[in-house]
Amino acid sequence: MARYQCPDCQYVYDESKGEEHEGFAPNTPWIVIPEDWCCPDCAVRDKLDFVLIEGSTGEKNISSNNTLSVSAKVSSSDVNTEISNTTMSAEIALDVATEGQHLNGRKPRVTNLQSGAAFLKWICITCGHIYDEALGDEVEGFAPGTRFEDIPNDWCCPDCGATKEDYVLYQEKLG
């Protein structure tokens, strides 16, 4: 297993340990981490800026079915389903880059603005950044009307680098 270091803040991603806060279980190889992932400590550097400091790349160990089994511990309550301290397992299909290829970026689908469903606001529990579905976020590439659930799961908060999982439904207080 390899270790990769952020050149700015010296954060180290260790494949053998993973990064559960970011959604990467132990033994998650560097190659399956999304290309647009950013450093969880400083949010200044992207994956491509990290430096291999120990071990070798595990690209040859990716299975041909492009599937990764993930087990994650949920440590805070989910607003909608009230999940708390539960272990969840999931099987995630991955686009795996082979030598000489790049992962294909995908744009989220945009919900029809005329659908009649109310747009919601989501707040980052780490820094307070608010994502408003009605406004979208053109800097991040999300058109007005882009639903939060349509944003890629590997998206990071543009202000602090927190994961999408660190956002909760924002409810404005009236009066």
UniProtKB/Swiss-Prot annotation:
- The Rubredoxin-like domain covers 1-53, 119-170
Q: InterPro entries in the record, alphabetically?
A: Rubredoxin-like_dom, Rubredoxin_dom, Rubredoxin_ET, Rubredoxin_Fe_BS
CDD domains membership: rubredoxin (cd00730)
Checking PROSITE patterns in the record gives:
RUBREDOXIN, RUBREDOXIN_LIKE
GO: which molecular function terms?
electron transfer activity; iron ion binding
User: What does the UniProt cofactor note say?
Assistant: Binds 2 Fe(3+) ions per subunit.
Q: Which sequence ranges form a coiled-coil region, renumbered to this chain?
A: none
Binding residues annotated for Fe cation 2, in chain numbering: 124, 127, 157, 160
Q: Which GO terms describe its biological process?
A: alkane catabolic process
Its Gene Ontology cellular component terms are: cytoplasm
Residues annotated as binding Fe cation 1 are 6, 9, 39, 42
* Entry function: Involved in the hydrocarbon hydroxylating system, which transfers electrons from NADH to rubredoxin reductase and then through rubredoxin to alkane 1 monooxygenase.
Annotated protein name in UniProt: Rubredoxin-1
- Write down the species: Pseudomonas putida
